[in-house]
Amino acid sequence: MIANTAAYHFAVIDAPQALCDQLQARAEASGLQGTILVAGEGLNLFLAGAPSAIDGFYAELRADARFADMRVKTSFSEHQPFARLKAKVKDEIISFRRDDGQPLDYPRAPAIDPATVQRWLRQGHDDAGKPVVMLDTRNLQEIEYGTFKDALVLPIHKFTDLPEALAPHREALKDSTVVSFCTGGIRCEKAALWMLNDGMDNVLQLDGGILGYFEEVGGEGYEGRCFVFDERVALDAELKPLVDEPLPEPRPSAF
């Protein structure tokens, strides 16, 4: 059994390369595969391995006061969905390139828990009677596998395209409560913060993203699966993978 995890945390990282090297060595020693992204603004992790190794890795990470509150979303598969371990230092743990969307520079945008979103979707409005618009901040490749029913889907192929793609819809959204969402929370956190700082005061972020919603309340109101960036391809509302097969053996070198 393989534990598959997605986790991110915004925190000041003074020496990103040193931390990246440290986490890579720790993950390798634990037999983990996946991706470690480190930036001056924090960590973004997609790691998979034996459940005990995963637990140990995150326990040690949370022992660092900067990451004590890191939330980890976990699902399980029979097979390892990553071919190898990659560790990189980036300018941002998710590229947005908007100064007014940087979580270390502003208070976190208000978040809404999955149970409340589920209730609002059932009743067709928020607690003040305003229409609720679910705003998908992911790219079209991901959305093909599924999204919330009647979500506002933008024609974007990368996250940095979102502000321009959202512009034609802003007037129509002004009398609604907008709930931004994404896979695990990181993009909708940056998007919601940028929208608030750019004059949209009716924006919330779905706490934990789609995976958090699946984990806490299931798939009510969501149509299809949630795309993930590994060999599982997508997860259903029970966090079961669309594909769960052994990875192909590496081809022998011709040299």
Q: What are these regions, as identified by a protein language model?
A:
Residues R119-G129:
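A short acidic-Thr-Gly-centered motif at the start of a beta-strand
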Residues F181:
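Cofactor-cradling patches in redox/metallo enzymes
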Residues M1-P110, G129-V132, R138-V178, I186-F255:
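Rhodanese-like catalytic fold shared by cysteine-dependent sulfurtransferases
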Residues I112-W120:
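Phosphate-interacting basic helix/loop segments used at nucleotide- and nucleic-acid interfaces
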